[in-house]
UniProtKB/Swiss-Prot annotation:
Organism taxonomic ancestry: Bacteria, Pseudomonadati, Pseudomonadota, Alphaproteobacteria, Rickettsiales
Domain of life: Bacteria
GO biological process, one term: lipopolysaccharide biosynthetic process
Name under which the protein is recorded: UDP-glucose 4-epimerase
A Pfam family: Polysacc_synt_2
One example GO MF annotation: UDP-glucose 4-epimerase activity
UniProt entry keywords in alphabetical sequence: Isomerase, Lipopolysaccharide biosynthesis
Classification via CDD domains: UDP_invert_4-6DH_SDR_e (cd05237)
Length: 341
């Protein structure tokens, strides 16, 4: 599907960029693809990636999604875009909400507009469960990003740039996530700081995150939102699973929720569940393609939203301690940390 094509990954030196490049380099995709453009603002991370991966098909572009000209210039000749650049730390975005807006909303506007201007074939935009019923600046900015993508998708004619969204749960061991923090605290002999023990989060691996984007890329139609069905765990069980894996008896200290944190996350609202397609391991939420002349769209027999539940980290499959341990041991990051323990 990438034969002789050029792919751009915004925020390409982050966790997702590293994961998708690892997948491509271990498969035949890297042999088929014409070029992969890594677009990001951190020259040190780009240089580290260039040296580590050492592949002539990787091209590096310094720029910022906040700057339209830099993203537009880098997108000339691009066939596909994975838009992963974002500010994603919830407490940080609470203190600097305009920075979240500048990157997650206005930056996304620049990426989408540049893609349309350069006649890119398809764009996959990476979103988050925090965009569903958002209560924090990060989630609000990502919800607006989704709305931007869908609004632009609604205006596209057949044959024009296809815009799709993927919505993630918690990606385990990604940069800034809680698993690296817990492992660091275990290794340093410190207390494990847990915000709220009964708080639940979806558990996705970086492999899952790549699978979701590639699934959306292969199957996505104009304006689709894709969600991967994922299990969940409480934060306390996650911490105890890591303690057992590392043979740790560190004390646990409950510190209370941080700014903007929710008790549980939602990946699909009941409103979206009313129109979602169940694709087995995924939900597809099709775009509402109606215009503002609602009278001509009145129909009967639709699903009743009131009878449907949201898809949340509270009502998905809840993993017990043994199951969480087994899942964590499949992660390359955890295996690497075990070897270095």
């Amino acid at each position: 599907m990438f034969v002789d094509k050029t792919l751009m990954i915004t925020g390409g030196t982050g966790s997702f960029g590293n994961a998708v490049l690892s997948r491509f380099l271990k498969s035949n995709i890297i042999n088929d693809i014409k070029e992969i453009r890594i677009f990001s603002r951190d020259e040190k991370k780009q240089e580290d990636m260039r040296i580590a991966l050492n592949n002539s098909k990787l091209k590096f572009y310094i720029g910022d999604v906040r700057n339209y000209q830099s993203i537009d210039d880098a997108m000339h000749g691009v066939d596909y875009v994975f838009h992963a650049a974002a500010l994603k730390q919830v407490p940080t975005c609470e203190f600097y909400p305009m920075e979240a807006i500048n990157t997650n909303v206005l930056g996304a506007e620049n990426v989408l507009s540049a893609a349309i201007n350069n006649k890119v074939t398809k764009v996959i935009v990476l979103s988050t469960d925090k965009a569903v019923y958002p209560i924090n600046a990060m989630g609000l900015s990502k919800a607006l990003m989704e709305k931007l993508a869908i609004a632009k998708a609604r205006m596209r004619s057949p044959g024009e740039t296809i815009l799709c969204v993927t919505r993630y749960g918690n990606v385990m061991a990604s940069r800034g996530s809680v698993i690296p923090l817990f492992i660091h605290q275990i290794k340093q002999g410190k207390e494990l700081t847990i915000t709220e023990p009964s708080m639940t989060r979806f558990l996705m691996s970086l492999v899952d995150s790549v699978d979701l984007v590639l699934y959306a890329f292969e199957h996505g139609r104009q304006g689709d939102i894709f969600v991967q069905k994922s299990p969940a765990s409480t934060i306390e069980v996650l911490a105890k699973a890591l303690q057992e894996i590392f043979g740790s008896k560190n004390a646990i200290r409950f510190i209370g929720t941080r700014h903007g944190e929710k008790h549980y996350e939602s990946l699909v609202s009941s409103e979206d569940m009313a129109k979602a397609d169940d694709l087995g391991g995924y939900y597809r939420i099709p775009m509402d393609g109606r215009d503002l002349n609602y009278a001509k769209y009145f129909v009967t027999g639709e699903k009743k939203v009131a009878l449907l539940d949201d898809y949340t980290s509270h009502n998905t499959k809840r993993l017990n301690l043994k199951e969480v341990k087994e899942l964590l041991l499949t992660l390359d990051y955890v295996q690497k940390e075990l070897k270095n323990a």
